[in-house]
Regions:
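Bacterial N-terminal signal peptides that target proteins for export
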Residues: 1-14
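Bacterial N-terminal signal peptides
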Residues: 11-25
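Proline-aspartate-enriched helix->loop->beta-strand connector
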Residues: 184-203, 208
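Acidic/polar low-complexity flexible segments
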Residues: 313-321, 377-404, 423, 432-494
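Short, well-ordered beta-strand segments enriched in hydrophobic/aromatic residues
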Residues: 357-367, 426-430
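A short beta-turn/strand-edge loop motif at beta-sheet boundaries
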Residues: 224, 367-374, 434-439
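Active-site rim/loop-helix segments in enzyme catalytic domains that contact anionic ligands
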Residues: 24-191, 216-232, 236, 261
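C-terminal accessory domains and tails appended to enzymatic cores
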Residues: 31-33, 140-152, 158-173, 183-186, ...
Length: 494
């Protein structure tokens, strides 16, 4: 998967890198799931839409919101950020680049007003909108680096370290992970949704991936109090949703590369909802002026949602999370105005094995890892009896002849984890104790060169069913109607 950067010559020079967990002979990957038909809203539903930025609520769930209003179903829309750091908006709307923090704050206020007008086009009153005000383009960094004793993050353009908007849900809230999590848990517990429409974990925009991750943790924390089904919607993905422009007769379908590992559903959007959705998008004037051709392809006769199929691993079990045997994940050039770049080059797969007291991850490269390049593995654990802010958040950086382990940028002893390169094979082993003996594990792999980030996988979730001697807290089931895939008992590839 790729981050939002223009693809450079340096990145192109590394197009030989491919990540394939050493699981070619492991258990079958999480099975591809065809779109499992349509779902319908019904009596008793309560709809919560979690949008990373103003306009995402329309792109991902505009039809849902319109139908819910027509049926008298309660709705609430929550915006993670004000979208105040989109420099293209300044160039096209203000006809000049942003140079001062106050200009970014002004843009955030404008985008909030646009969201109110867009909601009115869908029939949603302003009283049902909540704006959190966290930093645009910054929330994935908060997820990775800003918990507990770590200082708050700083807004990219606003330069703020706390929510700077007086109209936000909690003005002055520090830009830290536990603050975002607390806000989401408060709002979810207050509204008690039955369905949550949220951004997708495979989305290439960092705020979109981050909002899904925070939402997952919030729902786990609220297990037993709130039972809601997640409906993640995809927005930023290479060469998807296809041709630009208004295509009201062509249905959305999942990217072929995301069929495996996700359970997809769709719902129909009627002509009246299509018209309302388009009108709502035009209300986001700062975005419409420069990217109407990117927004319109989401106005279709259906809306599409696909959640992670979460595998369960028992000791000795292994699973492939991704598989692309014919190399369809080859990189592509940047494909939109925001600099949405290519996939992780030639990504074939990602696999995980659970040993009795450690988790083992291996990666295969087409060629040995070039000098100056690195592969980084993130592993964040979750368990219900420890605040997530206090859980280790490990990042293992693997270079051709060395590795280092950090927890929120703090260097940790090498005994915290083990990693090595052997020709085209990369491998890492992390003791469960280093992860505080989690019940669930977030995993991600990234590649980088000296001058430019190259790419990243989605964040994946694995449930760990450890042996009694190492398992600290058993969790059976989830409030989010998760689908799980069993992993076979096989030997580690190394």
């Amino acid at each position: 998967m790729a981050v939002l950067f223009f693809r450079s010559a340096a990145a192109q020079s590394l197009t030989s890198i491919l990540l394939l967990l050493a699981g070619c002979r492991l258990a079958a990957p999480v099975a591809p799931a065809a779109v499992a038909g349509q779902f319908q809203l019904g009596d008793g539903d309560r709809i919560l839409v979690l949008a990373p930025h103003p306009d995402d609520e329309v792109l991902g769930a505009g039809g849902v919101l319109r139908e819910a209003v027509e049926q008298g179903i309660p709705v609430r829309v929550v915006f993670l950020t004000h979208g105040d750091s989109n420099e293209w908006s300044f160039l096209f709307y203000r006809k000049r680049p942003v140079v001062l923090p106050r200009a970014a704050l002004t843009m955030g206020t404008i985008r909030q007003r646009e969201a109110v007008v867009a909601a009115e086009a869908l029939g949603v009153p302003a009283a049902d909108l909540t704006f959190l005000g966290y930093p645009d383009y910054g929330t994935l960094g908060i997820w990775r680096f800003h918990w507990g004793s770590r200082p708050p993050d700083r807004g990219r353009l606003t330069r703020a370290r706390a929510v700077p908007y007086s109209t936000a849900f909690r003005p002055g809230a520090p830009f830290k992970g536990e603050e975002i999590l607390a806000d989401l848990e408060t709002l979810i517990l207050e509204f008690r949704p039955t369905r949550i429409f949220v951004s997708h974990p495979a989305d290439h925009h960092p705020d979109h991936a981050a909002l899904y991750l925070f939402t997952r943790v919030a729902l786990w924390d609220l297990q037993g109090e709130v039972a809601a089904t997640l409906h993640p919607f995809l927005v930023h993905y290479p060469r998807w949703p296809g041709r630009k422009g208004f295509r009201p007769a062509e249905e959305l379908s999942p990217p072929a590369r995301l069929l495996a590992g996700f359970n997809w559903q769709t719902r129909g959007v009627n002509e009246e909802e299509i018209a309302a959705k388009r009108q709502a998008l035009t209300a986001h004037r700062t975005q419409w002026r420069y990217s109407a051709s990117r927004l319109l392809p989401f106005v279709r006769p259906n809306e599409l949602y696909g959640d992670l199929a979460i595998p369960q691993l028992r000791p000795g079990g292994a699973v492939r999370l991704l598989e692309d045997p014919v190399g369809e994940q080859a990189a592509s050039a940047a494909n939109d105005e925001e600099g949405e770049a290519s996939e992780l080059v030639d990504l074939h797969g990602l696999s995980v094995k659970l040993a009795r007291d450690q988790v083992e991850i291996g990666m295969d490269l087409r060629e040995p890892l070039p000098e100056g390049s690195a592969v980084s593995l993130s592993a964040f654990g979750y368990r219900p009896d420890v605040p997530f802010a206090a859980m280790p958040k490990l990042e293992v950086r693997i270079e051709p002849h060395a590795y280092a382990v950090r927890d929120q940028l703090r260097l940790r002893p090498r005994s915290t984890a083990w990693a090595a390169t052997r020709g085209r094979k990369l491998m890492a082993r992390i003791p469960l104790a280093s992860l505080a003996n989690p019940d669930r594990l977030f995993l991600q792999v990234r590649t980088s060169s000296p001058r430019t980030p190259l790419g990243q996988t989605p964040w994946w979730i694995v449930e760990l069913r450890a042996a009694p001697a190492t398992q600290q807290a058993a969790m059976d089931g989830s409030s989010t109607s998760e689908s799980t895939a069993a992993a076979a008992d096989v030997k580690a590839p190394w």
